[in-house]
Curated annotation (Swiss-Prot):
The protein's required cofactors: Mg(2+); Mn(2+); thiamine diphosphate
Cofactor note: Binds 1 thiamine pyrophosphate per subunit.
UniProt keyword Acyltransferase, yes or no: no
Annotated gene: menD
One Gene Ontology term from the biological process aspect of the record: menaquinone biosynthetic process
Catalytic activity annotation: isochorismate + 2-oxoglutarate + H(+) = 5-enolpyruvoyl-6-hydroxy-2-succinyl-cyclohex-3-ene-1-carboxylate + CO2
The species this protein was found in: Cutibacterium acnes (strain DSM 16379 / KPA171202) (Propionibacterium acnes)
Name of the featured protein: 2-succinyl-5-enolpyruvyl-6-hydroxy-3-cyclohexene-1-carboxylate synthase
Role of this protein: Catalyzes the thiamine diphosphate-dependent decarboxylation of 2-oxoglutarate and the subsequent addition of the resulting succinic semialdehyde-thiamine pyrophosphate anion to isochorismate to yield 2-succinyl-5-enolpyruvyl-6-hydroxy-3-cyclohexene-1-carboxylate (SEPHCHC).
Enzyme Commission number: 2.2.1.9
Assembly: Homodimer.
Length: 508
C-alpha cells in the first residue's frame, strides 16, 4: 500500500472512531486519497459523504451539519480551494459550531517553488481554529495519527473546553495518489473523550432583572426568566422565544421609560440584532451577567462572565413582568413583517420544517413580529458574523443533519448571493429545502439605518443595489421548482416541503 493511501485510510478510520458520521467532500487531485477512502467507508456504512463542487458552498453545508448537531468533516484539495472555505471557518469560530477541516496539500519540498496549485496553507485561517496543525507527507499511519485526529475532533466539539469551533488539519500527500486496490474497512473501536462536568455558578439577582436571550441561548433562558418572574427578550434563533415571559416587540419596549428601572441583565447566547439591547448592555449602572464560554462583553461593562448558571437567590417584584407585558403592544406590520410573523407561526405546528432565517432585514422582521406561543420553531441562523453568504448552503446542511425538511427565508440579495448552492450533482441525495425569497429589490436594511439620509442615487446604487434577476429561470436552471406568490397567499406554508423549492414573494 502506498503511503498516501495508508494515511488517508487511517485518517478516515480515525474520524469515524472519534464520532464523525458526515463528511462534505470537494473533488480534486491532491485530496483524491481521502476521496477513495471515503467512498469505501461509505460503502461499508460507516458514514455519509456529500460531494460539492464549490468549496465556499461546501463549507456552509458542513457548517449547517454542525448546527444540526452533527459535527462534520470538510475535505478540500490544495490551493485556492482552501481559501474558499474561509468564510465558513470564520462563522464556525464566531458562532461556536464544530467544523473539522481537512485540506490536502503538496509535500513541503514543493512549497515556495512555484509548483502548480501550491501555496502556504499552514495557518491560513489565522486565529479562528481551535487547533491547527500539519500532517506532513510521510507521517506514520498508526496510533499517532489516531491520537491527532481524536485531539482535533475533541477540540472541534469543545468536549474539554466548552468552546466548540473549527479545527484544521493540513495533510500533505506525495504521489502516488491512487490506491493499489479497494479498501475493506474492518471493525471500529470507538475513541471518545468525555466532557468534564461543570458545576453551575450560583447567582443572586435583583428583582428588576431582564433576561436577554441571543442566538443559541437554549431553553435555559426561558427557565431562568420563569423562575425569577422576569421579562424575556429573546431573539428568534435563541431557542427560548416561547412562553408567557417572552415579549414580541421588545425593541419598542426598550425605548420606553421602563428601561430606566432595569437593575440587572442576564445574558445568554449571542445577542446581535437590536441596537436598543446593545445600549442596555452598555449601561454602566446595570449589572450584566453573561454565560458565554468565550468573552462577549462588547461594551466592556459586564460585572460577571461565567459558564453555566443557576439562581441561588431571587428578589421578586410581582408587578415587574406585568409592566413589561403591558408595554408590549402590537404594532401594525408591513406586508413583509406580516409574512415573517405568519411563517414563524406555521413553523410551530407538528412536523413543521426547520426554520433557517437569513441575515440583514429579514431576521429583524422576525425579531419584532414573531409572536411567542406555547411552542417555538426550531429556528437557526448564521449569527456568528451575521453575513448573508452561505445561507442556503447552511440550510441544506441543517436538513441533511436533522433528516427534516427546511424552510429558509431570505431577502433577494441573500438569494442571489448563494443561489448556486441549490446546484446538486446527479448522484447526490435530494434535500428537502424551501427557499422563500422576500423580494423587495435590494438591501432594505439600509433604508432603516443612517445611510437612508444619503442622496437617492447614492443610496440606490451603493447600498440598496437592486439586481436584475429572473429567480424563476435561475431556480429551474439549478434543478429547483419555482412559484411566485403574493404576500397574502399563504397556501405554500400548508404544503409539504419536498425537494428543492424556490418561492418568490414580490414586495414592491
Amino acid at each position: 500500500m502506498n503511503p498516501s493511501t495508508a494515511v488517508a485510510r487511517r485518517l478516515v478510520n480515525a474520524l469515524v472512531e472519534a464520532g464523525v458520521e458526515h463528511v462534505v467532500y470537494c473533488p480534486g487531485s491532491r485530496d483524491a486519497p481521502i476521496g477513495y477512502a471515503l467512498a469505501d467507508a461509505e460503502t461499508a456504512g460507516w458514514l455519509r459523504v456529500y460531494v460539492r463542487l464549490d468549496e465556499r458552498s461546501a463549507g456552509f453545508v458542513a457548517l449547517g451539519l454542525g448546527r444540526a448537531g452533527c459535527p462534520a468533516a470538510l475535505v478540500t484539495t490544495s490551493g485556492t480551494a482552501v481559501a474558499n472555505i474561509h468564510p465558513a471557518v470564520l462563522e464556525a469560530d464566531a458562532a461556536g459550531v464544530p467544523l473539522i477541516v481537512l485540506s490536502a496539500d503538496r509535500p513541503a519540498e514543493m512549497w515556495h517553488t512555484g509548483a502548480n496549485q501550491t501555496t502556504v496553507q499552514t495557518g491560513i485561517f489565522g486565529s479562528a481554529p481551535r487547533l491547527s496543525t500539519d500532517v506532513p507527507a510521510g507521517f506514520p499511519a498508526d496510533e499517532r495519527l489516531d491520537a491527532l485526529v481524536l485531539r482535533a475532533v475533541t477540540a472541534a466539539t469543545g468536549a474539554l473546553s466548552a468552546d466548540p469551533g473549527p479545527v484544521h488539519l493540513n495533510v500533505s500527500f506525495r504521489d502516488s495518489l491512487v490506491p493499489d486496490g479497494p479498501w475493506q474497512p474492518q471493525a471500529l473501536v470507538p475513541r471518545r473523550v468525555s466532557s468534564f462536568p461543570t458545576a453551575p455558578t450560583p447567582l443572586v439577582m435583583p428583582a428588576r432583572t431582564v433576561v436577554v436571550a441571543g442566538d443559541g441561548a437554549g431553553s435555559l433562558a426561558r427557565e431562568l426568566a420563569q423562575q425569577g418572574g422576569w421579562p424575556l427578550l429573546a431573539e428568534p434563533t435563541s431557542g427560548s422565544r416561547v412562553g408567557d415571559n417572552a415579549l414580541t416587540d421588545y425593541q419598542t419596549v426598550l425605548g420606553s421609560e421602563l428601561v430606566d428601572d432595569v437593575e440587572a441583565v442576564l445574558v445568554l447566547g449571542h445577542p446581535t440584532l437590536s441596537r436598543p439591547v446593545s445600549r442596555l448592555l452598555a449601561r454602566p449602572d446595570v449589572t450584566v451577567v453573561t454565560d458565554r464560554s468565550r468573552w462577549t462583553d462588547v461594551a466592556g461593562v459586564a460585572r460577571v462572565v461565567t459558564g453555566p448558571v443557576e439562581l441561588a437567590e431571587i428578589d421578586t417584584d410581582p408587578a415587574w413582568l406585568g409592566r413589561w407585558k403591558d408595554a408590549d403592544r402590537p404594532v401594525v406590520p408591513t406586508a413583509k413583517q406580516r409574512l415573517c410573523r405568519d411563517i414563524w407561526w406555521a413553523c410551530t405546528t407538528p412536523n413543521a420544517p426547520v426554520l433557517v432565517i437569513g441575515a440583514s432585514e429579514v431576521i429583524r422582521c422576525f425579531d419584532r413580529f414573531a409572536v411567542p406561543g406555547d411552542i417555538a420553531p426550531t429556528a437557526l441562523a448564521n449569527r456568528g458574523l451575521a453575513g448573508i453568504d452561505g445561507t442556503i448552503a447552511t440550510a441544506i446542511g441543517v436538513g441533511l443533519g436533522t433528516g427534516r425538511p427546511v424552510r429558509v427565508v431570505v431577502g433577494d440579495l441573500t438569494f442571489a448571493h448563494d443561489a448556486m448552492s441549490l446546484l446538486l450533482g446527479e448522484t447526490e441525495p435530494e434535500p428537502d429545502v424551501q427557499v422563500v425569497v422576500l423580494d423587495d429589490r435590494g438591501g432594505a436594511i439600509f433604508s432603516g439605518l443612517e445611510h437612508a439620509a444619503a442622496p437617492a442615487p447614492v443610496l440606490r446604487r451603493m447600498f440598496l443595489t437592486p439586481q436584475r434577476l429572473d429567480s424563476a429561470a435561475l431556480a429551474h436552471a439549478l434543478g429547483a421548482s419555482h412559484r411566485r406568490v403574493s404576500p397574502d397567499d399563504l397556501q405554500f406554508l400548508d404544503e409539504p416541503v419536498v425537494g428543492r423549492q424556490v418561492v418568490s414573494v414580490p414586495l414592491t
